[in-house]
From Swiss-Prot:
It is an enzyme of class 5 (isomerase). The active site is at residue 60. HAMAP family: TruA (MF_00171). It comes from Salmonella paratyphi B (strain ATCC BAA-1250 / SPB7). Substrate binds at residue 118. This is tRNA pseudouridine synthase A. The gene is truA.
Length: 270
């Protein structure tokens, strides 16, 4: 009918947690399991209409998230409990909604973000783990976390990360601004915590791969600075495994007032 008004459109942001070990990454792909596909299916069931989500960062196969942020638009008016408890009831057990927030029209999960934060968890023990095997990377040689931390500080600020960039990276520029990078030990766990405005493909895992060589005393502390200056991926160490990597937080301007739950992974003290 010509005089009929269109339904209002709501923009919703969600915080998402997932164990990426059984998925071929975040992004929806044909004939393989993806986190995006499972989330969109659950949201569509609750909204009773097709839902497409946009995420803050597309994680690779096997990589986890405790602080992923997505947004979507819908004409379905639902209570917050529907977008949390209701969606979780329709999700597989290894994906969960952590929070929901109605956001203004100019919010975008990817383009409004000012920084992303990752944590890489290394289980540094002579014997391999079992229960947490898909949530940590096992490294059996003793690691000097303080040495790794000192070596990593040269990565702070705006730099060309070509030496730590995957060959297939499609980003237009290798330049990124690292705001902090800390390496700490928590019992048998060594945690690499890194925050940047954005990351080139495999950047965290490539940095960790080289830091492991420093931590095991196979390379001097100065090696990381030398790699950074060389701008040559072939000189750096192998890419660290996906299992230990978590997207733990995404920063946005305060005006969006998004929730900030503990970053995790939740088996570690925050």
């Amino acid at each position: 009918m010509s005089g009929q008004q269109s339904s209002p459109v709501y923009k919703i942001a969600l915080g998402i947690e997932y164990d990426g070990s059984k998925y071929y990454g975040w992004q929806r792909q044909n004939e393989v399991r993806s986190v995006q596909e499972k989330l969109e299916k659950a949201l569509s069931q609750v909204a009773n209409e097709p839902i497409n989500v946009f995420c803050a960062g597309r994680t690779d196969a096997g990589v986890h998230g405790t602080g992923q942020v997505v947004h979507f638009e819908t004409t379905a008016l639902r209570k917050d409990a529907a977008w949390t408890l209701g969606v979780n009831a329709n999700l597989p057990g290894d994906i969960a909604v952590r929070w929901v927030k109605t956001v203004p029209d100019d919010f975008h999960a990817r383009f409004s973000a000012t920084a992303r934060r990752y944590r890489y968890i290394i289980y540094n023990h002579r014997l391999r783990p079992a229960v947490l095997a898909k949530g940590v990377t096992h490294y059996y040689e003793p690691l000097d976390a303080e040495r790794m931390h000192r070596a990593a500080q040269c990565l702070l600020g705006e730099n060309d990360f070509t030496s730590f960039r995957a060959v297939q990276c499609q980003s237009r520029t290798p330049w990124r601004n690292v705001m902090h990078i800390n390496v700490t030990r928590h019992g048998p766990y060594v945690v690499v915590d890194i925050k940047a405005n954005a990351f080139v493909h495999h950047m965290v895992r490539n940095i960790v791969g080289s830091l492991l060589e420093v931590g095991a005393h196979n390379q001097p502390e100065s090696w990381i600075a030398e790699l950074l200056a060389a701008r040559d991926r072939t000189l750096a160490a192998a890419t660290a495994k996906a299992e230990g990597l978590y997207l733990v937080a995404v920063d946005y301007p305060d005006r969006f007032d998004l929730p900030k739950p503990p970053m995790g992974p939740l088996f570690l003290a925050d």
